[in-house]
């Protein structure tokens, strides 16, 4: 037996999505295109003022009107879901997140659970949440399912220290090794 998975370490990282920060569409542009493709009156001037990503959707010959409307409704749903005012065109499920250098980028939050002793990956979870605050229960559940055992210890950095994480660990009877905030 290689390991007992006695101690599992949790961490998250922000990974840039396949989308430029400039390749985004705004709420207003989405609504203009939806109005246009649904047959409502839209001025030529408004269509000409669309930024390049919105123009590409408007002019795309490979998509029929129904596909464009479906894409635009999906984008509109992302505005509602995220509260953000811009959505990436190439990857509408990615989110603006703060990177390690403090810059904002279109990205995903990747959570990992790794066996402390052997460095074997127990679980990976890709999320749209821009911070790690409430990710501990999800990634630990995935790890327990994958390794088919409950670790005795879970270690994580300070960002995971909150009532939700602590209650989860207490309910599971797992010792949490999470430092206090400074």
Where are these regions (language model features)?
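Polybasic low-complexity intrinsically disordered regions
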Residues: 1-174, 179-181
């Amino acid at each position: 037996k290689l390991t007992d998975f006695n101690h599992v370490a949790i961490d998250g990282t922000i990974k840039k999505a396949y989308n430029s920060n400039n390749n985004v569409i705004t709420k207003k542009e989405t609504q203009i295109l939806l109005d246009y493709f649904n047959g409502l009156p839209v001025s030529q001037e408004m269509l000409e003022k669309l930024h390049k990503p919105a123009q590409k959707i408007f002019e795309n010959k490979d998509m029929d009107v129904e596909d464009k409307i479906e894409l635009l409704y999906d984008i509109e749903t992302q505005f509602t879901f995220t509260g953000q005012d811009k959505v990436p065109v190439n990857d509408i499920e990615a989110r603006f997140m703060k990177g390690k250098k403090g810059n904002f980028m279109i990205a995903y939050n990747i959570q990992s659970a790794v066996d402390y002793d052997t460095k074997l990956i127990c679980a990976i979870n890709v999320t749209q949440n821009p911070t790690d605050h409430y990710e501990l229960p999800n990634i630990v559940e995935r790890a327990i399912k994958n390794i088919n055992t409950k670790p005795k210890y879970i270690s994580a950095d300070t960002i995971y220290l909150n009532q939700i994480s602590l209650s989860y660990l207490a309910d599971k009877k797992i010792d949490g090794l999470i430092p206090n905030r400074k």
